[in-house]
Amino acid sequence: MSTDQYRRVVVITGLSGAGKSTILRALEDAGYETVDNPPLPLVHDLVARGEGPLAFAVDARSRGFTADGLALAMERMRQLPGVRADLVFVRADTAALLSRYTETRHRHPLASGVGVRDGIRAEEILTASLVDVADLVVDTTDLPVTRLRAMIAERYGPEETGQGMVVSLISFAYPKGLPREADLVLDARFLRNPHYDPTLKPRTGQDRDVAAYIEADPDYATFHDRIDALLRLLLPRFVQEGKKYATIAIGCTGGRHRSVHLVEKLGEELRAQGWSVLRTHRELGISDDAPQAGAARVSTDDRNGRPEEHGSAQAPDELSRTTS
């Protein structure tokens, strides 16, 4: 259905500090009229009387907020003629939320008279039932702002400028944890490691000499070819299932050499096949600002992390001091 046949309405809810304001700003940049924290009883009327795409952030701050009340409001909005309403639930783990509140010294809306941790727990309980009814659940624990904004723009931006499904490629270090948003995780730790070559150790997988060293592994070509075959099978099927975003994470020990090279290599090849690609090197603190589009794809049948030593990725958090 084209954008002139329905009105987009996006309601953002979830945990305070998880990134609702970042998503709201991304939607505003995509042409939505946005309202932050309206009283829940007024949301239906605002949609019924409004024109054009609308986005709301509704959470524990909103007067009259309950999980059941928001679920009922979503049902009523979806019954309005010509309206397509989505519920987006944003969350992050407790450690990430505590870190963001400590950094900004903002007050948690449910922490009156108790600690921030207790406020976070109370909000998790208050909103838990909404996770199951949300159209999109986003965990921003390790998600950089650039990737969060690109994800939202690709899913909810104007269809005439959309690029179809975005393939997100992430390199990471296993000791620092798996990317939570990954649909598929690949392990490159068996490949020869440039870390043990004194001339290559300080470089990264973006370096030609490092790439040549890795590709000289006797099993590299087989590994690469099987990944390519797997993605040629999976990605078109993801599109058939209606996915707008597919995240593939490739890990190694340090997240600097082998995984970085494979993300760079696969990114180039996927763009050549016509996919829209977003690359993130979590441990290097590097991320594309927007998906890099490839050439028109030949149709198939049916058609954040937190780096420690190399710069920091901005937290996708309405509490962040900087703007994205």
UniProtKB/Swiss-Prot annotation:
It comes from the Bacteria. ATP binds at G14, L15, S16, G17, A18, G19, K20, S21. Pfam families: PapZ_C, RapZ-like_N. Keywords: ATP-binding, GTP-binding, Nucleotide-binding. The keyword GTP-binding applies. Residues 286-324 are annotated as: Disordered. GO terms for molecular function: ATP binding; GTP binding. Residues 299-311 have a biased composition (Basic and acidic residues). Belongs to the RapZ-like family. PANTHER family: RNASE ADAPTER PROTEIN RAPZ. Displays ATPase and GTPase activities. HAMAP family: RapZ_like (MF_00636). This is Nucleotide-binding protein GbCGDNIH1_0395. It comes from Granulibacter bethesdensis (strain ATCC BAA-1260 / CGDNIH1).
